């Protein structure tokens, strides 16, 4: 049984085997993704990923409730770019904590955050630990993008060695959802100045500039994005997430 949380009636929810049902909570964001991709890129991808996951699970015996996408996240690193909206870290923490508390109150035992914006990961990880301790439920944190998968890496244009935010992969996925939302003719490529330090330092707002100090807002080159590449990325990512959901089902 796979269903959408918001589409169930109270009586239907009462009949759900809540102790053995996974609630998948997609975490989106509302932030700039360069000149070419919409502010809601992460939220749009989160919704599409849920659709692809549902298709991949059609032949599986699994109880899964898809929670509505949380459309705003922790985007402090993008706050100086026009249109970006962010929670404060503790606001975001308390909002997610309260959702988990409500779900636990109703008897759900298996919760899974589907992180569709990297900036949400630290809070999701913290919530996972706290909720397990406070409510004796099993919270999991899943990453929405199989960006290290060799078949996904193979979609990136030859010579493009960096694709982090608002680049070819994310832009391609949005093109699957609604090609009219992508304005490739306005795209710019860019690599934030501190990429050499990326393994050691968290991304800060000041990192989203070029070496010359120009605000860039993306990491990568979106000009090679295509709908076909987006289909590959969404499909492979959904298949990888499904593997994790099966493990959670059997946990």
Predicted segments with their positions:
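Extended, histidine- and acidic-residue-enriched regions that form the cofactor-binding/catalytic faces
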Residues: 1-110, 118-251
């Amino acid at each position: 049984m796979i269903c959408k949380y918001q589409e169930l009636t109270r009586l239907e929810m009462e009949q759900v085997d809540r102790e053995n049902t996974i609630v998948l909570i997609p975490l989106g964001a509302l932030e700039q993704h360069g000149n070419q991709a919409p502010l809601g890129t992460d939220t749009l991808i989160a919704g599409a990923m849920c659709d692809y996951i549902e298709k991949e699970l059609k032949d599986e015996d699994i109880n899964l409730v898809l929670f509505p996408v949380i459309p705003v996240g922790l985007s402090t690193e993008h706050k100086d770019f026009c249109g970006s909206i962010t929670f404060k870290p503790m606001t975001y923490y308390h909002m997610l904590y309260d959702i988990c508390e409500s779900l636990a109150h109703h008897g759900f035992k298996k919760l899974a955050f589907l992180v569709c914006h990297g900036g949400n990961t630290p809070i999701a990880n913290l919530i996972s630990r706290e909720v397990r301790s406070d409510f004796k439920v099993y919270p999991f944190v899943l990453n929405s993008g199989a960006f290290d998968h060799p078949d996904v890496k193979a979609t990136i244009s030859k010579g493009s060695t960096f694709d982090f935010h608002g680049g070819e992969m994310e832009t391609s996925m949005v093109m699957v959802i609604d090609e009219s939302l992508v304005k490739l003719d306005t795209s710019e490529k860019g690599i934030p100045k501190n990429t050499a330090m990326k393994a050691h330092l968290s991304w800060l707002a000041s990192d989203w500039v070029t070496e010359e100090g120009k605000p860039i807002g993306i990491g990568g080159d979106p000009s090679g994005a295509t709908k076909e590449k987006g289909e590959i990325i969404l499909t492979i990512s959904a298949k990888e997430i499904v593997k994790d959901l099966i493990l959670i089902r059997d946990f």
